[in-house]
Amino acid sequence: MLLMENKAVENINIELPEILVTPSELKKEIPLSNTARSTLADGRKAIENILERKDHRIFVVVGPCSIHDLKAAHEYAAKLKELAEKVSDTILIVMRVYFEKPRTTTGWKGLINDPFMNDSFKITDGLRIGR
């Protein structure tokens, strides 16, 4: 009988384990403001009303697909809000931002995975920034 050498087969590409912040910890650390909570609730209700044909408007979901520059994302959101107010009688504009790039196999993986775009993979920082 051949004896197997004790060779590592699990976690061989792990440099350093890092415990991630949990969703409940993150919610406690960075709670939603009353304004954000109201915006979310009102937006969800408006979409529900459109889907149930209680509201005649259409809704349009727009990007950006992913963000890396928070200042630019805030500027984009402000411009989009102006447009949304102008067309609000007929269209509900919903801004959707994704914090990861799930179909990307090479290069930057997104704000959560690599928030500083330097391959440091500070995921907990990315989660906080995304929140």
What are these regions (language model features)?
Residues 39-57, 68, 72-86:
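Generic N-terminal targeting/processing segments that precede catalytic cores or assembly contacts
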